[in-house]
């Protein structure tokens, strides 16, 4: 099961159907879980994502869209799940993923400032998913919680594309990163299941 991919897709759907469900955000590029390339020789570092089992470069920032977003997993921690009953274990595992959502928008097209969009995205990212939303009974809990944001556009761009990259952001560009955590409690057997 591509657990994290599915959760990010659900999170994107939640954002687009909720806090971003308005005309200003209809021309959007919404990417799933993305990764940074490891530069070879002089090739530039850049984010990419997998779509239909093919590698696709993330077009961000791209001013042909009013808005774009992609997510990266920065690290995963594992925590104990307290047993609720007596026995040899409850078969549950708790993963806490530190994530970053990288957001670009064109202020002229959306008519929103960086701070306005940051607040909208943060409000939408703070969400606890139900089992019904996730489509599997093996997941006990999926909760996204915003931790902090970096609205220094140049620093975020440099972190994504490297020191040597020319930052092409225009005055009307809104570009920032939101760090959030995903807490996932699942049955261990859920991780090898392919039913969802």
In which residue ranges do the predicted regions lie?
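Low-complexity, serine/threonine/proline-enriched polar segments
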Residues: 38-41, 45, 127, 131, ...
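Small/polar-rich, solvent-exposed N-terminal microdomains that initiate assembly or binding
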Residues: 1-86
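Generic serine detector
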Residues: 28, 34, 43, 64, ...
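Extracellular/virion structural assembly segments
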Residues: 86-96, 100-135
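Short acidic, gly/pro-rich beta-turn/loop elements at beta-sheet edges
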Residues: 81, 109-111, 190-194
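Short, charged interaction patches at domain edges and termini
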Residues: 1-29, 86-92, 138-196
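Sequence-level detector for tyrosine residue identity
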Residues: 31, 35, 48, 65-70, ...
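Ordered hydrophobic segments in well-structured contexts
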Residues: 64-79, 90, 94, 98-102, ...
């Amino acid at each position: 099961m591509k657990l994290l991919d599915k959760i990010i897709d659900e999170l994107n759907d939640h954002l687009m159907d909720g806090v971003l469900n308005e005309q200003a955000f209809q021309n959007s590029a919404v990417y799933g879980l993305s990764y940074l390339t490891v530069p070879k020789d002089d090739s530039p570092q850049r984010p990419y994502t997998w779509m239909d089992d093919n590698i696709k470069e993330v077009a961000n920032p791209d001013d042909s869209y009013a808005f774009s977003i992609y997510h990266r997993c920065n690290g995963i921690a594992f925590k104990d799940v307290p047993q609720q009953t007596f026995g040899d274990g409850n078969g549950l595992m708790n993963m806490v993923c530190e994530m970053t959502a990288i957001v670009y928008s064109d202020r002229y097209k959306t008519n929103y400032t960086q701070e306005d969009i940051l607040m909208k995205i943060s409000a939408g990212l703070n969400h606890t998913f139900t089992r019904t939303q996730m489509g599997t009974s093996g997941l006990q809990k999926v909760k996204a919680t915003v931790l902090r944001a970096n609205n220094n556009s140049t620093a975020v761009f440099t972190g994504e594309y490297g020191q040597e990259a020319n930052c092409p952001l225009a005055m009307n560009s809104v570009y920032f990163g939101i760090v959030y955590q995903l807490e996932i409690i699942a049955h261990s057997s859920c991780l090898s299941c392919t039913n969802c």
